[in-house]
């Protein structure tokens, strides 16, 4: 298995499902073992919230904004994510900002919209590969008909949903997150004896990392419907795969089914 990232599905630019492949070793140098055919699903959101400063605005400070990476249901992502680096516009002092603990967020003031590149690092027993995301900071409100008046009370919210899938995870990672309310695990073998929950790198030093009581949480978008859409899509794909597998088995047992043409269109 190559170290790579695969886009499994993409409803639009703001909704993606990604599979991150790790190094194909069932056991690493630390003795950690992978669980074959198991997948861990972690829904994350990257976004920004910007408030217009109104009368307090100056030429180069018109908005106060916060950019962040959070759990889709505001649960703690510190069990999965170790560090997030936000790459701001080069006009900012120290444009490369490192956040080493949840909540993974930073706030600034400015006047212009720009693309923020985001690098997500996972704990060593989660994945060896970093995840590169990008987010366009939005300051000016608009709707389907175009720009609308600015308000100091209602912020501009821009968020995107990413469901990250980790195949063949380490046992220690699964043990740490198998009771996590926002993380799903598929195909856990019956009778699997998990080791004690792994202490992920510096996770034990981190403070409470959920964003349920974050000051900006009232403005966070809800993604429960998106999660259901991905679940339905995954279920449909599994059914289709099972049907295709059954058809192949029938062909092997009984030969080509009557009325079914060969895929090439030619007689064999």
Curated annotation (Swiss-Prot):
Signal peptide: none annotated. Its main location: cytoplasm. Transmembrane segments: none annotated. Residues 34-180 form the YEATS domain. It is found in: Cytoplasm; Nucleus. Disruption phenotype: No visible phenotype, due to the redundancy with TAF14B. Decreased FLC expression leading to earlier transition from vegetative to reproductive phase. Taf14 and taf14b double mutants show a pleiotropic phenotype that includes small size and abnormal leaf morphology. Taf14 and taf14b double mutants flower significantly earlier than single mutants under both long days and short days conditions. Expressed in roots, leaves, inflorescence and flowering tissues. InterPro entries: YEAST_sf (IPR038704), YEATS (IPR005033), YEATS_dom (IPR055129). The keyword Cytoplasm applies. Residues 227-252 form a coiled coil. One of its GO terms (biological process) is regulation of photoperiodism, flowering. Keywords: Activator, Coiled coil, Cytoplasm, Developmental protein, Differentiation, Flowering, Nucleus, Transcription, Transcription regulation. It holds the Pfam family YEATS. One of its GO terms (cellular component) is NuA4 histone acetyltransferase complex. PANTHER family: PROTEIN AF-9 HOMOLOG. Belongs to the YAF9 family. Component of the TFIID complex. TFIID is composed of TATA binding protein (TBP) and a number of TBP-associated factors (TAFs) whose MWs range from 14-217 kDa. Component of the SWR1 chromatin-remodeling complex. Interacts with TAF4B, TAF5, TAF8, TAF12, TAF12B, TAF13 and TAF15B. Interacts with the transcription activator complex FRI-C. Interacts with SWC6, FRI and (via C-terminus) with FLX, SUF4, FRIL1 and FES1. Interacts with EAF1A and EAF1B (via HSA domain). Negative regulator of flowering controlling the H4K5 acetylation levels in the FLC and FT chromatin. Positively regulates FLC expression. Component of the transcription factor IID (TFIID) complex that is essential for mediating regulation of RNA polymerase transcription. Component of the SWR1 complex which mediates the ATP-dependent exchange of histone H2A for the H2A variant HZT1 leading to transcriptional regulation of selected genes by chromatin remodeling. This is Transcription initiation factor TFIID subunit 14.
């Amino acid at each position: 298995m190559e170290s790579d990232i695969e886009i499994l599905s993409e409803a639009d630019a703001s909704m993606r499902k990604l599979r991150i492949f790790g190094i194909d070793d069932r056991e690493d140098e630390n003795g950690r073992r992978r669980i074959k055919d198991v997948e861990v699903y972690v829904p994350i959101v990257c976004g920004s919230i910007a408030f217009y400063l109104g009368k307090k605005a100056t030429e180069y400070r018109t908005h106060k904004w916060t950019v962040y990476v959070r759990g889709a249901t505001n649960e703690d992502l510190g069990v999965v994510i170790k560090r997030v680096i936000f790459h701001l516009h080069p006009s900012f002092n120290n444009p490369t900002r490192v956040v080493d603990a949840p909540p993974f967020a930073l706030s600034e003031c400015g006047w212009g919209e720009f693309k923020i590149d985001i690098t997500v690092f996972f704990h060593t027993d989660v994945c060896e590969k970093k995840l590169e995301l990008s987010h366009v900071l939005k300051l000016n409100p608009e709707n389907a008909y175009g720009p609308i008046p600015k308000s100091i009370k209602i912020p501009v919210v821009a968020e995107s949903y990413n469901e990250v899938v980790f195949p063949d995870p380490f046992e220690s990672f699964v043990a740490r997150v198998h009771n996590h309310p926002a993380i799903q695990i598929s195909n856990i073998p019956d009778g699997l004896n998990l080791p004690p929950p792994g202490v992920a790198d510096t996770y034990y030093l981190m403070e409470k990392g959920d964003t349920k009581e974050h000051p900006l949480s009232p403005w966070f978008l809800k993604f429960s419907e998106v999660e259901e859409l991905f679940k339905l899509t995954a279920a449909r794909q599994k059914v289709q795969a099972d049907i295709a597998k059954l058809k192949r088995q029938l062909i092997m047992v009984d030969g080509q089914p009557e009325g079914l043409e060969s895929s090439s269109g030619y007689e064999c």
